[in-house]
């Protein structure tokens, strides 16, 4: 199951880019650094071409992010996306994913939004923006809803990733704290994230 793979990998790299070539460079740096789950956002021009290119990559678990409507979800799934992430909950996206039997991670902030997403059949939600609430918010949510799987995006860094997991997240989305500097910098940061993740799992 894709959900289990995301949890096992622990880290989802949120990849943005001004062009396919730029995004591809970031992806390769992440893969070299050991991060296998890659969320390619719709802010990348012609992102579906890139999804198609990497959908059968042996090491990569490719998903799509910044999905705002059903057509975007459908096009990305058609290209080979294994999971779909959106900044907020979308009924349209939910229906497409349910129909195509593809994992959907809707963005949620409040407990009411999380309950709505779960009522619609979703097991994992994206807590976004994560840095608004911080890691302790996850523990507070999981007290009354222990079975919800949470992936925070925004505010997760090498320095605080262990705090997020200590408070009960299932995996984390990392973007700007990973995708910065040179490609070598990104690869080294990815390695640092993976090293920290290995310690958390141990």
Segments the model singles out, each with a brief description of its role:
Residues 16-19, 64-70, 86-90, 106-111, ...:
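Glycine-rich beta-to-alpha transition loops that act as phosphate-gripper elements at the mouths
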Residues 34, 58, 80, 88, ...:
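Conserved functional loop/turn residues at catalytic and ligand-binding sites
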Residues 69-79, 112-120, 137, 156-172:
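Catalytic cores of alpha/beta
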Residues 26, 93, 97, 113, ...:
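Aromatic/hydrophobic pocket-lining residues that form π-stacking "cages" and hydrophobic walls in ligand
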Residues 39, 63, 85, 105-106, ...:
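Conserved beta-strand positions in the central sheet of alpha/beta enzyme cores
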Residues 1-82, 99, 147, 158-159, ...:
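Conserved N-terminal beta1-alpha1 strand-loop-helix module at the mouth
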């Amino acid at each position: 199951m894709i959900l289990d793979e995301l949890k096992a990998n622990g880290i989802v790299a949120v990849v943005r880019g001004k062009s396919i070539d730029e995004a591809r460079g970031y992806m390769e740096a992440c893969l070299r650094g050991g991060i296998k789950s890659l969320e390619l956002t719709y802010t990348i021009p012609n992102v579906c071409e890139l999804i198609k290119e990497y959908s059968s990559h042996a090491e990569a678990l490719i998903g799509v992010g910044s999905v705002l409507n059903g057509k975007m979800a459908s096009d990305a799934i058609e290209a080979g996306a294994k999971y779909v992430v959106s900044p907020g909950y979308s009924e349209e996206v939910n229906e497409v994913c349910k129909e195509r039997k593809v994992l959907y991670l809707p963005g949620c902030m409040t407990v009411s939004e999380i309950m709505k997403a779960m009522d619609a059949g979703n097991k994992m939600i994206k807590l976004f923006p994560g840095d608004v609430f911080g890691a302790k918010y996850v523990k507070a949510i999981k007290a009354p809803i222990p079975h919800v799987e949470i992936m925070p995006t925004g505010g997760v860094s090498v320095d605080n990733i262990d705090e997020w997991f200590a408070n009960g997240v299932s995996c984390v989305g990392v973007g700007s704290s990973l995708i910065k500097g040179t490609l070598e910098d990104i690869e080294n940061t990815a390695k640092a994230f993976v090293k920290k993740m290995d310690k958390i799992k141990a």
